[in-house]
């Protein structure tokens, strides 16, 4: 099996662990390469779309995993080894490495995680695994949002910002903003206003077969943030269109119960 190891850049403990993992994989007959992930600035794709690896092992936290999915020209199976603070996306702890590697000769069950395809005024600008965030450039300023679902006006409100999350991202920023935890097998858009002016503006869960468009009606400077990694300036009257991406992220299913894992992770926050 050809395996790409992606580790968090500049962390000596992570780098040492990645070399130990590489030696273990070689011992089991796998071919490996290591990519040191720099979380800052632009970077080339992790690999050629014509010759992708069979598996990507990410050593780090959720941020490293999110950036890895963005920098893959095609989606291949991912497994995360948690070297972050919480690691909702990482199913394996460092001490479980040997057991996982010993099972790589067996068929690996996959879990497809829905992603959001994003366009601004009709132009594709990115894909989100966790969430897309719309906020002002200046603190303590509100934006005015007009929401269309399948071309019909659904809501108009003012808020400090708006989170549009996948079920995977429901345990991230959306949860901190008061959104519900959503089973990742449920495919939908979770729309969570940030500090809305009216208390009646509550989170919505929208079926992924629908198309959602968000128009900024205010004149305040704003930006779109994708998975906490990419920032894009938004002009007044910009329309952000969201739809289900045809290319989901693929994760190795390590056999953990989702709700048990969430309960365990939240206890450590």
UniProtKB/Swiss-Prot annotation:
It is found in: Cytoplasm. It is an enzyme of class 2 (transferase). This is NAD kinase. The active site is at residue 62. The lineage of its organism: Archaea, Methanobacteriati, Methanobacteriota, Stenosarchaea group, Methanomicrobia. Involved in the regulation of the intracellular balance of NAD and NADP, and is a key enzyme in the biosynthesis of NADP. Catalyzes specifically the phosphorylation on 2'-hydroxyl of the adenosine moiety of NAD to yield NADP. GO terms for biological process: NAD metabolic process; NADP biosynthetic process. Keywords: ATP-binding, Cytoplasm, Kinase, NAD, NADP, Nucleotide-binding, Transferase. GO terms for cellular component: cytoplasm. The keyword Nucleotide-binding applies. NAD(+) binds at residues 62-63, 130-131, 141, 158, 160, 171-176, 195, 229. It holds the Pfam family NAD_kinase_C. Its main location: cytoplasm. One of its GO terms (molecular function) is NAD+ kinase activity.
